[in-house]
Amino acid sequence: MTRAFIREKKWERALAFQTRNPLHRAHEYALVYGVEVLTAQGFYAGAVLNPLMGELKGDDVPAATRMLCYRKLHSERLLGQGDKDESIWKKAGWDISDVFELIGLDIKMFYGGPSEAVMHGIYRQNYGFSDIVIGRKHADAPFEDGKAIWGDFDAHEIFDNLKGELHIQPCKVGFAAFYESLGRVDLTERHEGEKPYSISGTKVREQLQAGERPDPRIMRPETSDVLIEAYRK
């Protein structure tokens, strides 16, 4: 069904974005960046938010709540709003929202780090995707004491050393954050020595649980409102 959908769209490349989280703007930017790279290369490329809908850890946001966030992003054409590179889309002749789609994937999360990143690539290849976003700490979870099991970019490196016939291409994305100098989110590797605006994930959750919207430089109000309502129940 997904393969048929991609064919119907007539995309030359189809980029999948794997996630188990509601998207704050830095998360969202990984998909924006990935499809902009392909579009700038001259491809008519689709950007598919492809969240896992199966079993997760107990402290992860439930799938039903996350889907409300994702649907809001999709239906209100919010992807990349304020963060996309307008020059790329002007040259292409279409907008990022015109090639943005939402398709859930009903598999569980194993929190297996780099090996699971490869598994996620295999799944997406089987579904007809040509590319997959591989971010920092992909499929990551720490030890019980909070210490890291894997390095931030181990999932990037594993794709460099694969043997066999995995044809899907990893779109490797690093840290992203909001920069006042740009007035938008960008990759931190482009801003050496510049401090981004940031809030810890713990602080964001505390604000949402208290019924407060996090700073819109971190999370879109539309996403915040869905999560605030969910925490009230």
What does each model-found stretch correspond to?
Residues 1-22, 26-233:
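Active-site cores that bind ATP or allylic diphosphates and position pyrophosphate for catalysis
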